[in-house]
Amino acid sequence: MQHTFALIKPDAVQRNLIGAIINMIEKNDFYISAMKMLQMNRQQAEGFYSVHRERPFFNELVDYMISGPIVSLILTGENAVTRYRELMGATNPQNAQEGTIRKSFAISLMENAVHGSDSDENAIIEINYFFNAFERIR
């Protein structure tokens, strides 16, 4: 079994899509090992997206991510990183396939409902960024 990190973004939380997204996750044979809702501050969002610091969209991304609450999750399952990325769909919802989270719920390239780790290594980093050892179910 493998773990991956998932995040339901502010636009999806504000549109009351948490339950619908979790339903899709669970129907695709993921086990939710940990979950919490939080409001990121600017420092937390800048730290989480530090890899994009030099990109022109960085400040807009940070502003968006602190615009409302998020839901962070640890998902567990076979090939969790790859399978969750497939379930999310393409970053740009216009390119996402039917049946994916982003095709179903994304508004735009920025307001694309969810985030997911892009590698095993980043899954560990992102899980550790949001969850301490006491918040995880093995």
Swiss-Prot record:
PROSITE patterns according to UniProt: NDPK_LIKE
Keyword Translocase: no
Catalysis: reaction(s): a 2'-deoxyribonucleoside 5'-diphosphate + ATP = a 2'-deoxyribonucleoside 5'-triphosphate + ADP; a ribonucleoside 5'-diphosphate + ATP = a ribonucleoside 5'-triphosphate + ADP
One Gene Ontology cellular component annotation held by this UniProt entry: cytoplasm
Active site: H115
Keyword set includes Phosphoprotein: yes
Cofactor(s) the protein needs: Mg(2+)
Classification via Pfam families: NDK (PF00334)
EC number(s) per entry: 2.7.4.6
Keywords attached to this entry: ATP-binding, Cytoplasm, Kinase, Magnesium, Metal-binding, Nucleotide metabolism, Nucleotide-binding, Phosphoprotein, Transferase
Biological process, per Gene Ontology: CTP biosynthetic process; GTP biosynthetic process; UTP biosynthetic process
Molecular function in Gene Ontology: ATP binding; metal ion binding; nucleoside diphosphate kinase activity
InterPro entries: NDK-like_dom, NDK-like_dom_sf, Nucleoside_diP_kinase
Subcellular location: Cytoplasm
Binding of ATP, residues: K9, F57, R85, T91, R102, N112
Family of this protein: Belongs to the NDK family.
Subunit structure: Homotetramer.
Function: Major role in the synthesis of nucleoside triphosphates other than ATP. The ATP gamma phosphate is transferred to the NDP beta phosphate via a ping-pong mechanism, using a phosphorylated active-site intermediate.
Protein's UniProt name: Nucleoside diphosphate kinase
Source species of the chain: Lawsonia intracellularis (strain PHE/MN1-00)
Lineage of the species this protein comes from: Bacteria, Pseudomonadati, Thermodesulfobacteriota, Desulfovibrionia, Desulfovibrionales
Name of the coding gene: ndk
